[in-house]
Structure formats: C-alpha cells, structure tokens
Amino acid sequence: MLKRYLVLSVATAAFSLPSLVNAAQQNILSVHILNQQTGKPAADVTVTLEKKADNGWLQLNTAKTDKDGRIKALWPEQTATTGDYRVVFKTGDYFKKQNLESFFPEIPVEFHINKVNEHYHVPLLLSQYGYSTYRGS
C-alpha cells in the first residue's frame, strides 16, 4: 500500500511540475533589481506595469520584488498585446526604509513590445544617485 502511494505521489508530482514551469514561462515580463552599492538584491521594492494610452498611462499590475530582488511574473493574467509600456520602480521608499537618501524617488523604464510570444526581462542596477537598465534575457 505504501509503495503504491509513493508511486502515485511521484507520478502526480512529475505531471504537475511541467504545468507549474509552463505557467511561469507563459508570463512575458519579469524584472530584477540589484543594489550596486551593496551588491545584493533589492527586496520589497514596489514595481508597477503601465501601458501607454491616449491620455497618459494605464496601470495594469503592481507587485513587490522578492528576497532575490525579482518579480518573475509581472504581466497580468490578461492576454499580452503589442504597444508601448513602462515599469515604474518605486526606489525612494526602498532607500527610505534603510534611512538613506536617494536622488530618484521613482525610476520609470519605457519599452516597446512588438512580439507577444517573446519573454521580456527588465533588470535594474540601482544606487542612491544613479541607475542602469537594459533588455535582459
């Protein structure tokens, strides 16, 4: 009986794992923040995804970075469409929690999505008085 239970448990886990991996891969947008001053990930930073609209920006989703400075799935559950987007990193609050000043209270990074079947990764290398970003993989 125990052997049958173990076999069923392993089989169930094996079939579930591809579904979990596939769900994470289907999300087309991820971000990652590294603090260049400490060399460590920037955890608990609020990041907002917005789409360019006729009269400004339309908020699509908001999330916080995990302990590794990542949001692995920032795109909302709705279907992706081509267009102009931006992620806004709320960095002022991050530094304020550490009793540090920052020149940039927010860092908006605009980008264009032209292929909804590709993955887009936006890394942010951050310090109190500067930042760098690029299209990651």
Curated annotation (Swiss-Prot):
Induction: Induced by H(2)O(2), via the HprR/HprS two-component system, and by Cu(2+), via the CusS/CusR two-component system. HprR and CusR bind to essentially the same sequence within the hiuH promoter region. Its main location: periplasm. Its EC number is 3.5.2.17. Disulfide bonds: none annotated. GO terms for biological process: protein homotetramerization; purine nucleobase metabolic process. Despite its homology to transthyretins, is not able to bind to the thyroid hormones thyroxine (T4) and triiodothyronine (T3). It comes from Escherichia coli (strain K12). It is an enzyme of class 3 (hydrolase). GO terms for cellular component: periplasmic space; protein-containing complex. Residues 1-23 form the signal peptide. It catalyses: 5-hydroxyisourate + H2O = 5-hydroxy-2-oxo-4-ureido-2,5-dihydro-1H-imidazole-5-carboxylate + H(+). Belongs to the transthyretin family. 5-hydroxyisourate hydrolase subfamily. Homotetramer. It comes from the Bacteria. This is 5-hydroxyisourate hydrolase. GO terms for molecular function: hydroxyisourate hydrolase activity; identical protein binding. It is found in: Periplasm. Pfam families: Transthyretin. SMART domains: TR_THY. Substrate binds at H32, R70, Y134.
